[in-house]
Curated annotation (Swiss-Prot):
InterPro entries on file: Glyco_trans_1, GS/SS, Starch_synth_cat_dom
Similarity comment: family membership: Belongs to the glycosyltransferase 1 family. Bacterial/plant glycogen synthase subfamily.
The protein's name: Glycogen synthase
Binding site for ADP-alpha-D-glucose: 15
Broad enzyme group: transferase
Amino acid sequence: MNILFAVSECVPFVKSGGLADVAGALPKELKKLGVEVRIILPNYSLIPQKLRDGCTLHKVINVPLGWRNQYCGILKGEQDGITYYLIDNEYYFKRDSLYGHYDDGERFSYFSKAVLECIPHLDFEVDVLHSHDWHTAMVNFLLREKYQDNPLYEHIKTVYTIHNLQFQGVFPPEVMYDLLELGDEYFHSEQLEFYGNVNFMKGGIIASDQITAVSPTYKEEIQYEFFGEKLDGLLRKYNDKLSGIVNGIDTSVYNPETDSYITAQYDADSLYEKNENKRALQRYFGLPEKEDTPIISMVTRLTKQKGLDLVRTVFREIMEEDVQCIILGSGDSEYEQFFEWMAYEYPEKVKVYIGFNEELAHQVYAGSDLFLMPSLFEPCGLGQLIALAYGTIPIVRETGGLNDTVQSYDEETGEGNGFSFTNFNAHDMLHTVRRAIEFYHDKPVWEQLVKQAMTEDYSWEKSALAYKKLYKSLME
């Protein structure tokens, strides 16, 4: 079974969000199950030179884009036993950031066409083409509408994964007419038209044989108006080919037993070593070294989606508790400034690192006691899974993947791996934080809770089995 992942980013080459983690980890897990996965992505100038040096020029072709042919170099390389193809075109991919350019519609129209034009030249017979998010949604649409009549493509099945419905790739109609060479018959509400523009993600949903969302709860949520980003009606229409498969984490990267970034490695049976990480974290940030004061952390993009309005509303009330708080992340200036002000106001209790630091993030996961993630919506979420693996108990809102992966602690049965609240309400969150702090001070209960969190399986294995089953169903 041969699968081609068409993605706009992938670890270890280049990363702006969770899509890159999925594209980097899932193929390795599928390979263990006997599924051959290769990955095709743009050859961005941002890719580290040593990774590009590991690739060789496989072939040069031309890609028809509207009235002109564009150069396309196909580079080929291997990392961790996975074959990668990089689509080389400096005009489109020599930029200082992955996305957010005036010509993104043209850039990813080119990339979508390049993926399809490359397939006959890859020395790899593709059974299933698996596209991800808006950037490669049109690969599946163009395959169905423009390429499937060709014997080289007619057998290929398609899967499309929605990682975040909020970002849809909406562009002026000229992109469809001039670059993708699609006529008027595609510019109406049953096809690509979307409030007077063209919507790439809509194309992926319509044309793919199967659609997945990155958690079962998110799959349900996006069919309702509140979460549906104006595509809820379309998703209800195609509900029969929509499923939810929760993401995992790469346990070769996030594993407290082997993590070289943390001060002391540990497992569920050596939690005293976790306290060593806590002391190291307190020293790093200049916090008082108090072993019995819980550290609540957030490693997050500082955006509205992450529920930071709730945190802002009751932050001073949280500070009335005997806690320390560490925030690591960057994003909207209003949230950056708020947390910097809180660090100034509570110098003995609050520390903030604006930006991202991979090594420090690992130390925060290892050294904290509680991990706060009160998202407005969360397709899957990576932070809570990493926190659980490190025995740092998550406090989450019951939405998307948070609802699927965090089971609220039940003092009657002793079951659970975290704490959760239902409504997007600051005082519901505050109550849940206080409840978590209360149990933190009940050491036998807390130790049991941490062990339960750490001994669950957060790897990609279960997810990979679900994807393998999905691919297999398409080929029967």
